[in-house]
Every structure is written in C-alpha cells, then in structure tokens.
Amino acid sequence: MDVALVFSLLVMFIFFLQISFSFWEKAGGLVAGSADSSIKVSVDVVPSISIDSPSDVDLSPNIQETGSATGSATWNIKTNNSNGWKLEVSALDTPAMKSGSDSFADYTEGTPGTPETWSISSSDSEFGFGASGSYADASFSGNKYLGFDGSNRIQVAHRNAQAGGSGDDTTVNFKAEVGSGHNQPDGTYSATVTATATTL
C-alpha cells in the first residue's frame, strides 16, 4: 500500500477521534472542570411562652363561724426567651372572694402594695394571697401576703433567664379568715384568679 495513502488514512482517523472526543465531552461524558454554588440556610427561633392550668383550689378546712382556711396552686411556666419571664395574678371581681352579695374583703396591708405577715382585725373577714418557690419575688418570703386589686395584675415571681427544660414552678398561696368578732354569712364563696405569664 502506498505510504502516502496510509499516512492520509491515519491523519483522518486521528481527526475523527478528536471530533468524537470533543462531542462526547460536550455531551457530558467527561467533566473537564467544576463549578461551585453556595447558599445560606437559616431559621428564626422566636421567643415563646406558655403556662399550664392547675386544678381549682378548695380552701380548707371549712370555716365554722370563725377561723381561717388555706390552699395553693402551682403554675408552671415554659419559655425560650433568654431575657426571662414574669408571673402576675389578678382577680375577676372586687373584692375577689364573693358569694352572691356577700364577700370577704381583699386583704388590707399596713403599707399598701407591700406583702406582710397575715394579720386581720377580729371584726373583719379577709382574703389574700402570697407566693413561694425559687423564683417568687423576695417580698413574699417569710410567708407574707397581699390583697388582690381587682383586674390589676400584681407580680408574684420572675426570672431573668429562659425557663429550665421542664419549666419553672411558682406556687401561689391563698388564705381566707373570718375574725373572731365577725359574723360572716354562710355560703360557698369563690374567687376567680387569673395568672398571666409574660416574657421580659
């Protein structure tokens, strides 16, 4: 065979291979390089708060003519707010504890708005509350009490940090007393108390 012919055929074959390789590369048969594309993935965790609803409270023992009765309710607060929370209580009515047209007076402090050791006049009947627990306001320590102020909220506890994993507990202690010289009409007296948890 003629050498020139062989050479021509070889050149044509090499050219054909080059064309085929180029086509294969463009079709994705080979990756000749790389390209990057970056994105940011984000999520917002917003502050939230919840409070449970404990059972209704029956003060005990029953008051027969004179004497006192006590009871308590514990509220659990959960929040992821890093600044913390506060707990306030209020009453539906003024005075809070009623039975029809009869009532117990809201506890009267010697210094209005300052919790104090429970003490009432023998001629009165009064109803009030205190607070206890790790986050109860220090003013309530030593088993001190306040009177409700109708629907005005009164702070009883706070924490300047997010709640623990199982939430934070605060116990509100209730007390009603009929003085030895007071004639309180019989009946079932009740107070509707609302606890409000708020993020700080």
Report the location of each language-model feature:
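N-terminal Sec-pathway targeting helices
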Residues: 1-7
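Bacterial N-terminal signal peptides
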Residues: 7-20
